[in-house]
Each structure stands twice: as structure tokens, then as C-alpha cells.
Amino acid sequence: MDSSRTIGLYFDSALPSSNLLAFPIVLQDIGDGKKQIAPQYRIQRLDSWTDSKEDSVFITTYGFIFQVGNEEVTVGMISDNPKHELLSAAMLCLGSVPNVGDLVELARACLTMVVTCKKSATDTERMVFSVVQAPQVLQSCRVVANKYSSVNAVKHVKAPEKIPGSGTLEYKVNFVSLTVVPRKDVYKIPTAALKVSGSSLYNLALNVTIDVEVDPKSPLVKSLSKSDSGYYANLFLHIGLMSTVDKKGKKVTFDKLERKIRRLDLSVGLSDVLGPSVLVKARGARTRLLAPFFSSSGTACYPISNASPQVAKILWSQTARLRSVKVIIQAGTQRAVAVTADHEVTSTKIEKRHTIAKYNPFKK
């Protein structure tokens, strides 16, 4: 591969799917001159992906981890309420429930959950959330049904280094994000497919640029790039494979690859399905090599935390909008990527109805 091309994808920035709005921080009085952040919910509908009526509601919660009590205190009043020390913000994806009830009541039910947590470790530092108590309406959620969820601490806890390895820890839900989407449209690409490589393959990557609304004085800007129009983040996602040769064994030209990619009729959006995520929809025909990267309805979900945990955690509390999306064709092995130029293809739609909205569990 001796040259490079980029396919720029068109998107409508006015659509809700091109934005992810943050939760506004609202303080409420709780007496004695104290205030706390008011619980809030956010609802996003993704019916623009398909016409299916078999909708599910994906539930993502954001809240805070507290340490309950003090192990070092051995004497005290029995009537005293144990002290709750705020340690860090966190995210817990519960899974989905059928879209058959009142969504506001569903969000309210999440606030009544009793969840404890503790640290663990495998090849990565883990946070294990245990569901002690949950309302009936949430029982079909995967995490509630399993009674626990073990997640990567770096991806799901704002400051995992602040979480001790002992003591009683409690996760308190404060923000609930509900995304209504046809169930079959939420498709997370198998890790095995993402690791496939070969000299006879081209990798298709999505270069996504996201504008982030952030106070210039916030420490969050240290993790973002700056332009005349504000701050932004770049993401690089692996979205598929294509063969370097055709059925006759002849080398496939970049022009032919571009035509194949444009026939996919790709569109891209932002949503909160498995945490802040980039959603990709291919409305055109998909080749055999592309099949593992999309659901039967042509959709794929890319949690931003897998590409950049730091950017994903910024989007927990900041409004984000798609700025640009490009498809980049790269060589099929990492060694070849290192020594060859890339190829950009430019024509992908941005679903403007996809937004991550304002919600700020821990705005700095």
C-alpha cells in the first residue's frame, strides 16, 4: 500500500444523534444549610436506526462511591448514622428492559437500588458492584439478574486510585440515562473479530472528532485538543476488514475500495448505550469480511471507554457533538501500518439526532 486516502462521511450536525448532552448540575437544599446534587434522568431515542417496534431501554447509571463508616473508630453512639465519605464518581451499566412502562418511573426505580462495591484484580484492576436490593421493574436487567457486575476500574470509576482495597463501599445512583433502541440494533463487536489481521487484508478505521463543551479553566482541557472553535477529542475505531484482492486474485485498487465503502452507506452517531458510545449504521450491502462487525440490521456499538477511557469519562459530565467522521484504510498488520501510508475515504453521514446531553455528575 503506497498511498493513502480518507473517506469523509457526511453527517447532519443538527440531528439529536450527533450530540450527547450533559446533565445540568442542580443543587437542592437538604436542611441544616447543606445542599446535594439533585437526581436527574435523560432519555434518548434511537428509532432512526430501524423501524422496529421491539424496543428495549438500555440503562446507564452515574453516581458516586462512598466509604461507609470508619474502621479505625471503635467507640461511638449506637444512634449515630455512619459517616459517608465521598471517594469518586462512577458509572454502572445495568443492561436493558423491555420498553413497556413509564420511563420516568424506571429512572426513579434506579435511584432506590442498594449497591455495594469492592476492588478486585485480574490482569486489570477491577471494580465489583454487588446489587443488594433492586425494584421488581429492574429484575430483567442483566446486572440486576446476576446480582453483580465486575468491570474495568479505569473505565468505570472516575478516580480508581482513590478507592481503598478494604472497608464498606457503597455506590449511590444520582443520574440515570435511558436510551430507547431496537434491541437487535445494539451490537458490540466480538473481541476476536477486532484482533484479526493479515497481509491480505485492509483494516477500515473510523477517525471520529468530537467537540466537547468545557470551561477553558477546567482541568479537563488538559486531555483535549484546542481549536479556534473550542476543545475537541479524537477517537480511532476499528470498524471492519476488506480483502486486498478480488475473487479473481487481482489486486483491489483504492478506487474500487472507495466505491465499496460508499455503498455501505455508513452513518455515525453518539449515544449512551454502554456508556458514552459511537454508534455506526451500515444501510448498504456488507461483504463477508465485514459481517462480524455489524448486527443483522447493520448496526455496531463502540463504547468510547474502549478507545479512550479518559475521553469517555470527560463525556460523563460534558456535552459532546460530532465534528467530523472519516473512514481510513490501513494495511492489515501492525508492522505494515508502521511502514505504509494510510488511505482516507470521505463520505459518512453523522446522525445529528445523537447527542450526549448535559448531566454533570462531577463537572470540574
Swiss-Prot record:
Keyword presence, Lipoprotein: no
Query: What is a GO molecular function of this protein?
Result: structural constituent of virion
From the Swiss-Prot or TrEMBL record, state where the protein is found. Answer: Virion
FPIV motif (motif): residue ranges: 23-26
Instruction: Offer a single GO CC term for the protein.
Output: viral envelope
Q: Is Transferase given among the entry's keywords?
A: no
Family matches, as InterPro entries: Matrix_C, Matrix_N, Matrix_Paramyxo_C, Matrix_Paramyxo_N
**Which GO BP terms apply?**
viral budding via host ESCRT complex
The UniProt keywords, alphabetically, are:
Host-virus interaction, Viral budding, Viral budding via the host ESCRT complexes, Viral envelope protein, Viral matrix protein, Viral release from host cell, Virion
Q: In which domain of life is the source organism classified? A: Viruses
Q: What does this protein do?
A: The M protein has a crucial role in virus assembly and interacts with the RNP complex as well as with the viral membrane.
Q: What is known of its domains?
A: Late-budding domains (L domains) are short sequence motifs essential for viral particle budding. They recruit proteins of the host ESCRT machinery (Endosomal Sorting Complex Required for Transport) or ESCRT-associated proteins. The matrix protein contains one L domain: a FPIV motif.
**Sequence similarity:** Belongs to the morbillivirus/respirovirus/rubulavirus M protein family.
Q: What is this protein called?
A: Matrix protein
- Organism the protein comes from: Newcastle disease virus (strain Chicken/Australia-Victoria/32)
Identify the taxonomic lineage of the organism of origin.
Answer: Viruses, Riboviria, Orthornavirae, Negarnaviricota, Haploviricotina
What is the primary gene name for this protein?
M
